[in-house]
Amino acid sequence: MADQLTPSLDIPAALKPRDGRFGSGPSKVRPEQLQALTNTAATLFGTSHRQAPVKNLVGRVRAGLAELFSLPDGYQVILGNGGATAFWDAAAFGLIDKRSLHLTYGEFSSKFASAVAKNPFIDEPIVIKSDPGSAPKPTGDPSVDVIAWAHNETSTGVAVPVRRPTGSGGALIAIDATSGAGGLPVDIAQTDAYYFAPQKNFASDGGLWLAIMSPAALARVDSITASGRWVPDFLSLPIAVENSLKNQTYNTPAICTLALLAEQLDWLLGNGGLEWAVKRTADSSQRLYAWAEDRPYTTPFVVDPALRSQVVGTIDFTDDVDAAAVAKILRANGIIDTEPYRKLGRNQLRVAMFPAVEPDDVRALTECVDWIVERL
């Protein structure tokens, strides 16, 4: 592993990417977003979130997401504080009636299943598990009323298409889209709760969850509320729905997060929307995977090309190349956050290819890796 013996190498400036941020979240924030914060600071920061300037900002975010995902009639953009981690608990309290089914194939898909298993008001979930780097096929079960999986498993770089599985019946489809939303293709009509935090494809900060909820999901929220189930106010979906429809959050939101998100939505929509974003991430990922398959010392960690993510690429290295040393040298040269997910424990690099990342910078990254490996 990389240590004090890792050589000090200065990558030629001509090889380096223009922007060296490849983190899988928090991710690259475009300079134009930061400039927009400066331009609007006086009218937004330090003002009440119950008044027009901030409410208009929330409305701008909700309208932007509705346009980006071409929401069907009756679908609503709901939001609350706490990130996707908070939404897992909110869904356990307010979206699952009796029992859920979870596909788990990495750290984050497993965490939702774990949160549900700890909730005292619902039954033990069904968990269908596969090893990291692969994924189970979405399936239904007559005993469940929610079926959940991750559009993109950030820890491993596995992407699972979003389609209502055969045999799902009336079960709600809940998709963790934290690293998929805005960078992978999706038909929102195939989901009932498509939820995410904005620090990945949307190039914002964390601490906020957003969920695109279907009429069926909104009706489920109402029915669970009517049942009298106890729910902490902070995790209450009916409170989140009520406030969201007023372009508010239950408690004070981080204005910076909302403003960065709004700017990124404007940028995505101005360039062609989700179709453009998906083509861009496809371009970046094709460059990364083609390089990895061409080199004798690298292979894509995800063996099945159909499961390889367009937005988070994981690349294994042969035993004679220390990927940790490569990442350390990259970081010393301003090319950062290419380390693998900490708990995966593999000799690999992980590369985010969200829309804000230039495809040419992905190619430049691969050239830098080649340059380093030649000198190790």
Swiss-Prot record:
Record EC number: 2.6.1.52
Transferase is among the record's keywords: yes
Matching SUPFAM superfamilies: PLP-dependent transferases (SSF53383)
Region of interest called Disordered, as start-end residue ranges on this chain: 1-30
Biological pathway: Amino-acid biosynthesis; L-serine biosynthesis; L-serine from 3-phospho-D-glycerate: step 2/3; Cofactor biosynthesis; pyridoxine 5'-phosphate biosynthesis; pyridoxine 5'-phosphate from D-erythrose 4-phosphate: step 3/5
MF GO annotations: alanine-glyoxylate transaminase activity; L-serine-pyruvate transaminase activity; O-phospho-L-serine:2-oxoglutarate aminotransferase activity; pyridoxal phosphate binding
Any one GO BP annotation for this protein: glycine biosynthetic process, by transamination of glyoxylate
Catalytic activity: O-phospho-L-serine + 2-oxoglutarate = 3-phosphooxypyruvate + L-glutamate; 4-(phosphooxy)-L-threonine + 2-oxoglutarate = (R)-3-hydroxy-2-oxo-4-phosphooxybutanoate + L-glutamate
Modified residues annotated as N6-(pyridoxal phosphate)lysine in this record: 200
Annotated residues for binding of L-glutamate: 50
Cellular location(s): Cytoplasm
Main location per the UniProt record: cytoplasm
Pfam families, A to Z: Aminotran_5 (PF00266)
InterPro entries in the record: Aminotrans_V_dom, Pser_aminoTfrase, Pser_aminoTfrase_mycobac, PyrdxlP-dep_Trfase, PyrdxlP-dep_Trfase_major, PyrdxlP-dep_Trfase_small
Cellular component terms (Gene Ontology): cytoplasm
Residues that coordinate or bind pyridoxal 5'-phosphate: 84-85, 108, 154, 176, 199, 251-252
Highest taxon of the lineage: Bacteria
Cofactor comment: Binds 1 pyridoxal phosphate per subunit.
Subunit structure, as described in the record: Homodimer.
Role description: Catalyzes the reversible conversion of 3-phosphohydroxypyruvate to phosphoserine and of 3-hydroxy-2-oxo-4-phosphonooxybutanoate to phosphohydroxythreonine.
Family: Belongs to the class-V pyridoxal-phosphate-dependent aminotransferase family. SerC subfamily.
Protein name per the record: Putative phosphoserine aminotransferase
